[in-house]
Amino acid sequence: MGGWGSFGLAPCRDQFMRPRVISYLDVALSWLPALAVLLVGCAPTPITPVMDGERKAIPLLAFYYIWFDPLMWERAKVDYPLLGRYSSDDREVMQQHVRWARQAGIDGFIVSWKSTQKLNRRLEQLMEIARAEGLKLAIMYQGLDVEREPLPIERIASDLDLFRDRYAEDPVFDLFGLPLVIWSGTWKFSPAEVAQVANPRREHLLILASERNTQGYARLHYLVDGNAYYWSSVNPETFPGYPEKLEEMGRAAHADGGLWIAPAAPGFDARLVGGTRVVERNNGETMRRQMEAALRSSPDAIGLISWNEFSENTHIEPSEKYRTHYVELVAGMRLGEVPDIINFESSEPAETQSAPDRSRALALATLALLVVVSLGAIAMRSRSVSPVEGE
């Protein structure tokens, strides 16, 4: 948003012996150009879209987490949501997330999930809300435990059967014909283990690997329906050949007809959960570069990392630290404009006045006040000042 700036009054000159009443009119009129500039300055800063033309047809999917409980916000966090330290059971919070995402041009959420009573309940609530709001869903199945060790194959197979039988037929999962499941952590499993789970279920589900390089994908490509790389910690300024690596991975997935979901993130900082790497956000430039690199890799979708991963600080959800900046930036990249969104303090539909509109209203009110004051001064002076002789 443009700044208010500072504007001086042009001096009123009486050297041609005009009536003093005119000088007050000059004062009033001298404000008009300044306020015109002010109004222009209140307009939102234009953002050049990186998803122009045919690129807009590429789905933008944000990774979404439903694991939050109020006590979780007390550990390993340096930023917090504008909506407060919520529980993922809070329906109004979830509904607001979905509405914000849709307004920003996000097509769907990739939901982190495995079958537990709590996560199933939350997934079902999200399905209902997303269906009503027109947001699509996919699943990132958490194949590793909290120690980053692989879950038993029998557990994974059972969970995917539950998903297939209970949820997969819902139209909210209709992104690529069949419901999409990204198996997180496939690099920890042998081809035989992946085959044991994937082969009997690919008739009903699109099962993607989550391999981190082409060599890893090559060992599984005939067992899965593509690859989705969750690369949240890359620094585009320092990683050599970063865009080329994504392009290579895209070609590998497409070589035998698989899907390729390319990653993009706004930044990264997982030091409070044991990490050491920090990728600065650079006021949105990091995300812009990562989005552009992802698009260059000819993806079938972009996996935006993330909506609300606050522990690794990849979130774009409106927050205390970044406010609405990253949702607005996504909207600008996706749509070419910042929408007049969002009542970010509310769970109501986003139909309230935006910050640029509020600034314009304030500027107009200021203009009106100046005109009224100036006209009042004119009226008072005109009663007491006679015309100058000779006019």
Summary of predicted features, one role per range:
Residues 27-40:
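Bacterial N-terminal signal peptides
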Residues 2-8, 41:
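Residue-identity detector for glycine
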Residues 46-356, 361, 372-377:
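Glycan-processing catalytic domains of CAZymes
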Residues 30, 360-371:
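Hydrophobic H-region at the start of alpha-helical membrane spans
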Residues 373-391:
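C-terminal membrane-anchoring or membrane-association module
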